[in-house]
Amino acid sequence: MSGSSLPGALALSLLLVSGSLLPGPGAAQNAGFVKSPMSETKLTGDAFELYCDVVGSPTPEIQWWYAEVNRAESFRQLWDGARKRRVTVNTAYGSNGVSVLRITRLTLEDSGTYECRASNDPKRNDLRQNPSITWIRAQATISVLQKPRIVTSEEVIIRESLLPVTLQCNLTSSSHTLMYSYWTRNGVELTATRKNASNMEYRINKPRAEDSGEYHCVYHFVSAPKANATIEVKAAPDITGHKRSENKNEGQDAMMYCKSVGYPHPEWIWRKKENGVFEEISNSSGRFFITNKENYTELSIVNLQITEDPGEYECNATNSIGSASVSTVLRVRSHLAPLWPFLGILAEIIILVVIIVVYEKRKRPDEVPDDDEPAGPMKTNSTNNHKDKNLRQRNTN
């Protein structure tokens, strides 16, 4: 073997050796965590979720275990539906394994250590095996504190009177030091409401439907999770932002929409006027598509038909307080609609030409002179005529 071929042969042998060391598509791979659960502090009545994501070949099995506070060695397995159905376990297996543990309506007894276990060892469920060897573990500590007591005013229903409304919250008991408090509406902090006060008020001077929603008074503490209370401000739907008319050509697609303010979020219904009565759209033709998103609805009609689709459409919003409806007129034009202006101009030109031709034909016989008649009146000597009038007649006798 020549010296020049030695480096190439050596490189090839090294590549083969290294390739044999890498796990192939079907090679076994021990379980490992990609995402492990994180410790949290919660208040009574709240909920928490813990995530566990593992990889391995074959895909590892995932289990959830729990140990009470100060009893870290006394683990018990958690099952879906445990603790009066407050525990939910959702697990999915594919190229990796993912599991979510969720516990709602927390109590003080839910505090403790929660453990995600994963293993793809064939003997992992053999009781003669040591679980600490066949299973890998990731732990999270959940601390549940007593929620502070917050007294709130009653829910409000906005009427047409427009009388001022005052929302009130009072933090009556808390074992933690208050940092600050503020108001939110639908999850958004209201400006100029942040202060360090346990007794909070928010005033709506001229309440309207757009002022309705979920109001929260939120309290932040030095060494505890924030606490909040909810006051619902309700109002009947008020539809805004709709189109009064829509003009489309035959074969095109049409989209009509309605927006509303008011709380709770309404249920939407689309209707079309048939024989003077609004009837709910049945979509028997399969060309109607309705999309509803809380305070927004959309009606789409594809491949418009000039004989079926024109007319008056109505969107209706209804919630527990009241309802509202608005209508939109849909006009569908023929395919020839873009040519109508040109055809109109062409028709005017043709009519004008016909009028001119007819006029010329009627005018020409009157203007041709007759050969038997003199071309003009006879000329006379007007001067001589006047002189003859002044001459006296002489009697020759």
From Swiss-Prot:
A GO BP annotation: positive regulation of long-term neuronal synaptic plasticity
Regions crossing the membrane: 339-359
Listed GO CC annotations: dendrite; immunological synapse; postsynaptic density; presynaptic membrane
Domain (Ig-like): residue spans on this chain: 29-134, 148-234, 237-327
Membrane topology, as annotated: Single-pass type I membrane protein
Ranges for region Disordered: 364-397
Signal peptide residues on this chain, from the entry's feature table: 1-28
Disulfide bond positions: 52-116, 169-217, 258-315
Region (Narpin): 149-161
Location within or outside the cell: Cell membrane
Organism superkingdom: Eukaryota
Expression sites by tissue: Isoform 1 and isoform 2 are widely expressed with variable levels in brain. Isoform 1 is expressed in cerebellum and midbrain. Isoform 1 and isoform 2 are expressed in cerebral cortex, hippocampus and striatum. Isoform 2 is more abundant in the cerebral cortex than isoform 1.
Extracellular side: 29-338
Modification(s) after translation: N-glycosylated.
Pfam families in alphabetical order: I-set, Ig_3
Described function: Probable homophilic and heterophilic cell adhesion molecule involved in long term potentiation at hippocampal excitatory synapses through activation of p38MAPK. May also regulate neurite outgrowth by activating the FGFR1 signaling pathway. May play a role in synaptic plasticity. Also acts as a chaperone for ATP2B1; stabilizes ATP2B1 and increases its ATPase activity. Promotes localization of XKR8 at the cell membrane.
Domain notes: Some isoforms lack the first Ig-like domain which may confer homophilic adhesion activity. However, they can bind and activate FGFR1.
Protein name stated in the entry: Neuroplastin
Organism: Mus musculus
Organismal lineage: Eukaryota, Metazoa, Chordata, Craniata, Vertebrata
Gene: Nptn
